[in-house]
Swiss-Prot record:
It comes from Ectopseudomonas mendocina (strain ymp). GO terms for cellular component: plasma membrane. The complex is composed of six subunits: RnfA, RnfB, RnfC, RnfD, RnfE and RnfG. This is Ion-translocating oxidoreductase complex subunit D. Its cofactor is FMN. GO terms for biological process: electron transport chain; transmembrane transport. Disulfide bonds: none annotated. It is a multi-pass membrane protein. PANTHER family: ELECTRON TRANSPORT COMPLEX PROTEIN RNFD (PTHR30578), ION-TRANSLOCATING OXIDOREDUCTASE COMPLEX SUBUNIT D (PTHR30578:SF0).
């Protein structure tokens, strides 16, 4: 009896790139709904523009590289980058700001290195940091919750008309950084940006992204190592340097966990399988490094929220982390640590 020969591996996973990306997009829905409830249609406008621009840049570069458009566009990786970037940008951001951010994310953050699976940096965070440094006024103009009408927002995005004075307000992280003379209780009483534990409305947004992250964990699309490492490190750092609600306080552990882009970063950014560490121990170290850097930059740096900077800095360290945390090779007692000095 002739037995057929097949090439190994004989078992393969059921998750294709397209399916994984669709699951990630699905997991962002709770956060999108929370942001839309808080800021109105501005988040949806960002999502529509970012998706359009990201797909256009992706198609243009693929055409220039003479790659099949349909095959690569259908993996939805550009769409995931667009969604993460749109969620990080302020609602009702000008169209040209979204265009520049998407251009840097897709062209310089992804395609310049060869496309999906080759990028050393998280593309969405690279695009975000470029526009944050280049256009700080526009990037720090967050609208007050429930404070902008949909039509006025569209006019502002297109540059037809400006929004009324007072439409924007400082976020809780902004207020904490620039009002060091006030205690936490005084800030909470005087500033509507503060909620019970974190930023007003930001608590619900972070919990929504936490729900999406738990869905990804349930589907085994991510592991717990990087998110737990980041959140635990941020909690410990904020606990060590928390002195109550005095005027020199940097905020409580709950404040840091439920304010800004903490949960979005922990479950959707830090877990990037390409630009992060690859082993489980490496992912844990990577997440801890991000959490420490987030607190350091929030407390003593020049930017109120620091998830993007922390992730990009740890992207630089990811190869070194992989080098020292690589698992033991089969048949060897110790991990294969690569070359040694003197060899």
């Amino acid at each position: 009896m002739a037995l057929p020969r097949i090439t190994s591996p004989h078992a393969k996973g059921s998750n294709r790139t397209q399916q994984v990306m669709l699951q990630v997009l699905l997991a962002t829905v709770p956060g999108i709904l929370a942001l839309t409830w808080l800021f109105g249609a501005g988040t949806l406008y960002n999502l529509a523009l970012a998706s359009l621009f990201a797909l256009a840049f992706e198609a243009a570069i693929l055409a220039a590289r003479q790659r099949p458009l349909a095959f690569f566009l259908k993996d939805y990786s550009a769409l995931v980058t667009a969604v993460l970037l749109a969620l990080a940008l302020p609602p009702y951001a000008p169209w040209w700001l979204t265009l520049i951010a998407c251009g840097f994310a897709i062209v310089f953050g992804k395609q310049l290195y060869g496309g999906l699976g080759q990028n050393p940096f998280n593309p969405a965070m690279l695009g975000y940091v470029v526009v944050l440094i280049s256009f700080p006024v526009e990037m720090t103009s967050w609208p007050a919750p429930h404070g902008v009408a949909a039509l006025d927002g569209i006019k502002h995005i297109l540059g037809i008309a400006s929004l009324p004075d007072g439409w924007a307000q400082a976020t809780a992280l902004d207020a904490l950084k620039v009002n060091k003379s006030l205690t936490i209780d005084e800030l909470r009483a005087a500033n509507p940006a503060f909620g019970h534990f974190g930023g007003a409305g930001s608590e619900a947004v972070n919990l929504a992204f936490l729900a999406g992250g738990l869905y990804l964990l349930h589907k085994r699309l991510i592991t717990w190592h990087a998110p737990v490492g980041m959140l635990a490190a941020l909690f410990v750092m904020s606990l060590l340097f928390w002195n109550g609600s005095g005027s020199d306080s940097n905020g409580s552990p709950l404040f840091h966990l439920l304010t800004g882009a903490t949960m979005l970063g922990a479950f959707f950014i830090v877990t990037d399988p390409v630009s992060g560490a690859t082993s489980n121990r490496g992912r844990l170290v990577f997440g801890i490094g991000v959490g420490v850097l987030v607190y350091v930059i929030r407390a003593w740096g020049g930017y109120p929220d620091a998830v993007a900077f922390a992730v990009l800095l740890m992207n630089l360290a990811a190869p070194t982390i992989d080098y020292y945390t690589r698992p033991r090779s089969y048949g060897h007692r110790k991990p294969n640590s690569g070359f040694k000095l003197g060899e």
